[in-house]
Amino acid sequence: RGLGDVYKRQELNCEPTGEFAHNPEPLPENLTEIAAAVVREKADLGVVVDPDVDRLAFVSEDGSMFVEEYTLVAVADYVLSHRKGDTVSNLSSSRALRDVTERRGGRYHASAVGEVNVVAKMKEVGAVIGGEGNGGVIYPELHYGRDALVGVALFLTYLAQTGLRMTALRATYPAYYASKNKIALTPAIDVDKVLREIKDRYAGEQVN
């Protein structure tokens, strides 16, 4: 509701009833309703946040997902266009942030998974923007925490300045693909042994 000079806004599932209309995780399989609404209403974009408003995803004008991995990438691109500096994301994030950071003359740093680890690394290197590949944007100019509303403001500002449609903006970034699957671990699986074997097997390779 605080989007300012927006020509037309339509809300979906914004009333706090105590029950989620669908799985609240902002993943493509859970966002079919808003994707269809964006196309039906000929909207410029759709904005999606999770219940505690620390994850942010966008839907492009054609109903496709902007992909939450690229939320941070686009926001960082905007921030770095105005202020040179370094960026941080965790190891479960797209390499596209590294590409954008280096293109803007900065240095990318990776952290262990977890918001607390990202924040610690950001403070260590003095990063100007950081976050996680799940759509979490951390902008230290305001505070050291994932904040979807900050991400919305930065993203919309950048989109307005570029004059691009969502799909066109997305096309300006490298296309990387990731499969994030949860693996059930049992006591019979020696995780440390598996990691050691992977390290040994690829010892001669350059890991990035």
Model-predicted segments: where are they?
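Short, small-residue-biased leader/transition segments that mark boundaries at the very start
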Residues: 2-7
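Short Gly/Thr/Asp-enriched flexible loops that form oxyanion-binding sites at enzyme active sites
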Residues: 54-72, 97-98
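Short, charged, surface-exposed secondary-structure boundary motifs
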Residues: 17-24, 77-79, 118-122
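Phosphate-binding and adjacent anionic-ligand microenvironments
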Residues: 45, 83-208
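N-terminal small/polar loop signature for handling phosphorylated ligands or for N-terminal nucleophile
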Residues: 9-59
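Short glycine/threonine-rich catalytic loop with a Thr-x-Gly-x-Asp
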Residues: 49-51, 65-70, 143-146
